[in-house]
Design a protein with these regions (language model features):
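Mature catalytic core of soluble alpha/beta enzymes
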Residues: 2-360
Length: 360
């Protein structure tokens, strides 16, 4: 997690978010005014290679400086030292290494994130389980040696996936995994948490127009575009390679987060196996969904909900999202229908003839 966070490229120019970042929305006059004012503000920008993908920070504020970008790079480096599964110096690595043996003292940030992950697990009945690491390791999807595990291996890994076996000591600020072989994996909330931390930094420094793009799947719009127009975010076509879009959505001072079968997968025996695993079965989720996109004020919530609602499926996932205050979503099903919550239907503009809004 957060590999190569120290490698930074300074850049200006076109903004790439999901498939693309287009002009502002609103009335036509507002759009022209907002777009013109946005063009007059040259963003201060940095691109990091993090989380095995490219992330871009663009700050559209005349007060922004290179120092702010350096601070954000350092902030992401700090998160790496807390939440990386592969960095041997990280809190999470040490907690996993001591599984079944000892409680591990961690930073306040790590403690809070893991507690949040357990809260999400409780709220979703274990469908979003931060102890899913053994299953993720077993499938190894996204790497060259990914393959379908045998049933005995799968059952052994599934038995180790149990968030109820994660214990916390508030006074000592320690985390313990009760069973040997348990593995924490915060991939379902890690990018969202990091995006929230960057957003908090920007707001605390009075930088109120910015875009945070972590890997194309987790986007935070801090404020509106210069001039007050909305941002138009391109929506990934789940049947195409990264950069192809099915349409756009308008956001303003919000987060958008997507999960889908297109991100990481392998094919064995003519069957496609994607990376979104169902802790109940140990297998990739198969429920007729291609992708889900969440719009929320909070990036950590959006990151978690996009995975949890995907595992729930269309009917249960939609009902769950509609119970969450301040959260909207749309689901893309295998028949290319888009099922959106009421608050999103008028904000999605389709550009691909292959997709349609359900109910139209």
């Amino acid at each position: 997690m957060w590999k190569h966070a120290g490698k930074t490229i300074r850049m200006t120019g076109a903004l790439l978010v999901l498939a693309s970042m287009l002009g502002g929305c609103g009335s036509e006059a507002d759009e022209r005014t907002g777009t013109a004012q946005a063009a007059a503000v040259e963003p201060v920008s940095a691109t990091f290679y993090v989380y095995d993908t490219v992330a871009t920070i663009k700050i559209y504020d005349p007060k922004a400086t290179e120092r702010h970008l350096d601070d954000i790079r350092d902030l992401l480096g700090k998160i790496d030292l807390e939440l990386s599964r592969t960095n041997e110096d990280s809190d999470l690595y040490q907690v996993n290494a001591e599984a079944g043996r000892a409680a591990v003292p961690v930073s306040q940030g790590t403690f809070d994130v893991v507690k949040m992950a357990v809260r999400y697990a409780k709220e979703t009945g274990g469908l979003l389980d931060p102890s899913i690491g053994p299953l993720i390791n077993l499938w190894n999807i996204g790497h060259e040696n990914a393959k379908v595990p045998d049933k005995a291996q799968l059952e052994a890994a599934r038995r180790l996936t149990d968030y109820r076996r994660i214990t916390f000591d508030e006074a000592k600020r320690t985390i313990k995994l009760e069973r040997p072989g348990m593995v924490l994996d915060l991939g379902s909330i890690g990018k969202g948490y990091a995006a929230d931390q960057v957003s908090l930094y920007l707001r605390e420094h009075g930088l109120d127009s910015a875009l945070i793009n972590l890997g194309g799947s987790s986007i935070v719009a801090v404020g509106a575009k210069p001039g007050g127009a909305n941002w138009n975010v391109g929506l990934q076509d789940p049947d195409q390679s990264r950069g192809s879009q099915l349409g756009t959505i308008r956001i303003n001072d919000e987060t958008i987060d997507s999960s889908g079968v297109y991100e990481r997968f392998f094919i064995q025996g003519g069957v496609r196996y994607h990376h979104i695993l169902d802790p109940r079965t140990g297998y990739p989720t198969q429920n007729g969904l291609k992708s889900i996109t969440i719009v929320s004020e909070n990036a950590t919530d959006a990151d978690a909900l996009s995975t949890a609602a995907f595992v729930m499926g269309l009917e249960d996932g939609m009902a769950y999202i509609e119970r969450q205050p301040g959260v909207e979503a749309f689901f893309v099903t295998d028949d290319n229908a888009i099922h959106a919550t009421q608050g999103l239907r008028d904000r999605i503009m389709l550009s691909s003839a292959l997709y349609r809004m359900a109910g139209d």
